[in-house]
Regions:
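Cytosolic juxtamembrane helix and N-cap/initiation of the first transmembrane helix
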Residues: 1-19, 29-39
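Hydrophobic alpha-helical membrane segments
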Residues: 71-92
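Short juxtamembrane and helix-loop transition motifs at transmembrane-helix boundaries
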Residues: 1-2, 34-36, 60-71
Length: 131
């Protein structure tokens, strides 16, 4: 079996914010953890918007119209939530509250890097080099 460096690079980049949050759970706490609250709140807002636009809005439309015919897809703010959460994790290293909230936001942010990897994993044109 041949190692696919594109997939290894994709896993490394897309899950680095998750690894940072897990590392932050075990790191010693800094006194400046409060500086992470603003980027974390902004990242949570963007993540919530992405979750709403990806899952909740189509579900509500389907309930009202009994199908998705005529539904207009609306894009959220991809990657911005992940960047804000990463900044929050860097500012609040060692804070278990910031790390746990960051993991939660990374989970719900469907426009973030981890979700990009999950959604595109089966796309051979993206991850496999041309033969």
């Amino acid at each position: 079996m041949r190692l696919n460096f594109r997939r290894v690079l994709g896993i490394t980049i897309c899950f680095s914010p998750v690894a940072l949050a897990v590392w932050s759970l075990f790191a010693p706490r800094r006194p400046t953890w409060w500086a992470a609250l603003i980027p974390l709140a902004l990242g949570a807002s963007i993540g919530s918007l992405n979750l709403y636009l990806s899952w909740i809005r189509p579900w509500i439309y389907r309930l009202r119209n009994h199908s998705l015919e005529g539904y207009r897809h609306a894009s959220g703010a991809p990657v911005i939530g992940t960047v804000l959460v990463t900044l929050a994790l860097l500012a609040g290293v060692g804070s278990k509250l910031i790390a746990a909230a960051g993991l939660l936001v990374l989970t719900i942010d469907t426009g973030g890097l981890p979700w990009f990897l999950v959604q595109t994993w089966g796309d051979k044109s993206l991850w496999n080099p041309a033969a």
